[in-house]
Amino acid sequence: MSRLFLLGALLAASLQGTASASCPDFLNHSMRQLASTDTIQFCEAYEGKALLIVNTASYCGYTRQFEGLEQVHREYADQGLVVLGFSSDDFFQEDNDEGDAAEVCFEKYEVTFPVLATSPVRGSNANPVFKGLGDAAGYPRWNFNKYVVSSTGDIVGHFSSGAEPDSEELRAAIEAALPAASS
């Protein structure tokens, strides 16, 4: 009986190690969602998914890009893409009240993709996701920088604020990152 238990424990440990090994370090974190107590553990929630990660703000000239990001989210969700917004006040254009920031995202722009609670996205104080992205591909120089991460965890591209969600270059990177394309 104890041998069977030991075998089961070893099998469970090896499977757990495999799951965490396939998750890049920069995504192996949990963060709280905007204006919520709910958290997302990125590796568990988005294993095998491509990600479009964007640093967002409510009062920026690029805030209108929420519309295009929502369109990308709706267009590619069934193909394995998740758009993730990371609210940030690093450029002093995010509302200090999370409820008001959430109102901009979810009511004004009718965003349905996840947006995370306000956190730093650049420098030594960057949240762990943006620390990994920034170290590997460069930190955001403004709001609405976009990072495309493949379903295997590779950073496919980093796009500046000026790259519109419907740009050919961004769309090409997204399509290359989708699960069928990157496996």
Which residues make up each language-model segment?
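Amphipathic alpha-helical repeat scaffolds
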Residues: N55-Y59
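N-proximal helix/coil linker or "cap" segments that precede and/or mark the start of modular domains
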Residues: L15-S30
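Loop/turn elements at helix/coil->beta-strand transitions in domains of secreted/extracellular proteins
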Residues: E47-L51, A77-V82, Y109-P114, N143-F144, ...
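Thiol-/selenol-based redox modules, centered on thioredoxin-like
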Residues: P128-K131, D135-S183
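Terminal helix/beta-alpha structural elements that buttress the NAD(P)+-binding lobe
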Residues: N28-S30, A117, S150, L178
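A short beta-strand-turn-helix
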Residues: H29-A50, Q71-Y76
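Sec-dependent N-terminal signal peptides
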Residues: L4-A13
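Structural microenvironment flanking redox-active thiols in thiol-disulfide oxidoreductases
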Residues: Y62-A126
